Amino acid sequence: GFGKTKKYSDGKKVENIEDLFFEFLRVAEDIKPKVIVAENVAGLMMGEAKQYYYKITNEFEKIGYDVSSMVLDSSHYGVPQTRKRVIFIAVREDVTEAVGLTFMNIAGIFPDKFSEAITCGDAFSDLEYDEEEIKMLTEKFSKGSHFETASKMPKDPDKVLTGCDYHPKGHHFNMKRISRHKPAPTITASGGCIHWSEMRKLALCESQRAMSLPDD
């Protein structure tokens, strides 16, 4: 688990953070589990936001945990989506002492990357589509503000394309044309990803596959 730090997604310093971090630490201190696995946005390791990262590690140590962290990308571990998160592994100090764990031993717990990433083409290859949903998505997209920009983006690209590169004023940064040859970019609540060859946003079943969720 972990507290929300949405405002640190891009690594910028923000005052008056609205997150659950201290509540999370309070619960951890009360329960005192042997091991804590926590995650947060990768932006926590960037720029001025890194001050908050150091605060997190210091707080873990204050309540009696040896902690190690690493930025992992879900596309390296069998998920057809690029999603970077900083993962914390904290082990209670009495446990590390009892079994002879060191900081380097804890860091070695993080998994090795898979040899090959799963592409969108691989992940979507056997999907059964709801034709009514596809029709609705296509019609809705054709009437939306992103249609003109999307029409300028090449179809079936070798890599993920970003809308701002095809908008005269650099707008539509969050719109991405996915590539069937690559994992999807990070799926967001705004649903900014569009199909590699069709003029529509991703269908529900495609988004589920990109997030490695079960079809049902």
Outline where the language-model segments fall.
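Short catalytic/ligand-binding loop motif for oxyanion handling, primarily in non-cytosolic enzymes
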Residues: 1-4, 44-47, 78-81, 96-98, ...
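Conserved Class I SAM-dependent methyltransferase catalytic core
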Residues: 16-82, 86-91
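S-adenosyl-L-methionine-dependent DNA methyltransferase catalytic core
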Residues: 59-62, 85-216
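Glycine-centered helix-boundary capping/hinge motifs
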Residues: 9-10, 32, 64, 212
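Conserved proline-anchored active-site loop of SAM-dependent methyltransferases
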Residues: 1-6, 35-41, 88-90, 187, ...
